[in-house]
Amino acid sequence: FVTGVQTCALPIFDLICVGKLNAKYFAEGVAEYQKRLAAFASFRIVELPEEKIEEKNASDAVVKKALDKEGRAILGSVRKGAAIVALCIEGKQISSEELAQFLADRANSGAGDVAFVIGSSHGLSDEVKRAAALRFSMGRITMPHQLARLVLTEQIYRACTINAGMKYHK
């Protein structure tokens, strides 16, 4: 113990994803940003299984049941006190600076832990969306969830560099 020296714990950022990252090139990209994030936060990736829906044209009730089960698993993976940031199509489109401000506000409030959530190909349950402190969308384009994971990981890193005053963001 050293008198007069204050240490601050790094925030914990969890990336909770439904489904696996199969493509090597996406996995390598995510791993690179995960490594870079170590200077700013403890960063953990949690992969949860996607509920199988057998019918090609499944009813809304079947999809809702699968989403609800995935949602319970997602919420069960969120650390106590962490803010949930849900990536969803109906979410708000935000800039890198706005994400940085959200993370800075969380850290300044003393509650810097954040759980970023990417649902399955069917989306997220209403329960997860209601629990989210922030719901955001990467835009109106459609992209594979594996690519979304890479882009989100890069944006988390970018937000951290913005908050640190680094030159990465232009």
Please tell me what each predicted stretch does.
Residues 99-139:
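A mid-sequence interfacial segment
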Residues 122, 126-170:
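Structured adenosyl-cofactor binding patch, chiefly the S-adenosyl-L-methionine
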Residues 16, 44-46:
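General small-molecule cofactor/ligand-binding pocket signal
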Residues 49-114:
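S-adenosyl-L-methionine/SAH cofactor-binding core of RNA-modifying enzymes
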Residues 21, 89-92, 120-123:
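Short glycine-rich anion-binding loops that position phosphate/pyrophosphate groups of nucleotides
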Residues 11-37:
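N-terminal beta1-alpha1 ligand-phosphate binding loop
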Residues 1-9:
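Single conserved hydrophobic/aromatic residue that forms the stacking wall/gate
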Residues 41, 81-82, 132:
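Short, well-ordered alpha-helix to beta-strand connector turns
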